[in-house]
Amino acid sequence: LGGTAIGTGINAPVGYVALVIPKLAELSGVPVTAAADMIAATCDTGAFVDISGILKRIASKLSKISNDLRLLSSGPQAGVGDIKLPARQAGSSIMPGKVNPVIPEVVSIACFEAIGNDAAITMAVEAGQLQLNAFEPLMAWALHKSLRHLAAACRTLQINCVEGIEANTVLLDARINESVTLVTALNPLIGYEKAAKIAKAAIATGKPIAEVAEDLGIMSREKMQALLVVDTLTAPGALRAS
């Protein structure tokens, strides 16, 4: 503001910038400041890229969270099913009882839009010539949409999804007790080869790893069950022989 055509300030009244900038800050409630270099600011619209890049990073993370929620809630019988998302629609018109993860899906849609807007803003910034940046309307519009839609996506994800998530405790407990991957924690105690032997036998027979370890004479069932406690397995460090 105040640089006029190419940043020199030609034809702008003397003192114009010093008068207008504080007034804009007062009216908007935003700490607006004048550009330190008017010519550089007129040539370069890189600030749009900076802000849009931050929004793209937020969008990629937000969509990743939504993807995780969709995967963890998949089911109820043919998916992961670790968690239950609140039902926000009646579900499928041809599959009774099916509940779709519509909130994570709509959040991902907003994220895809913001990522696409970032590409459009980048191209619009790059397409400027000297002090002429004819595509600033696109930059402003795309950035405005990204800000609005990502903010709305965050709110709806919190209110309509995250706050209503329930853990499928029965299924999770069963998986913890039956998981073959628990032998990973035994590596420091019995070594990789014996742990792998237990895992392969458990997969082949369908037996719990504690039972298999006892059958193979590697460790008693009672000792293994005492070692493979959830609180211990979810803390830093390695299992040690008592």
Please provide the spans of the model-predicted regions.
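Conserved, well-structured ligand/cofactor-binding cores
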Residues: 1-242
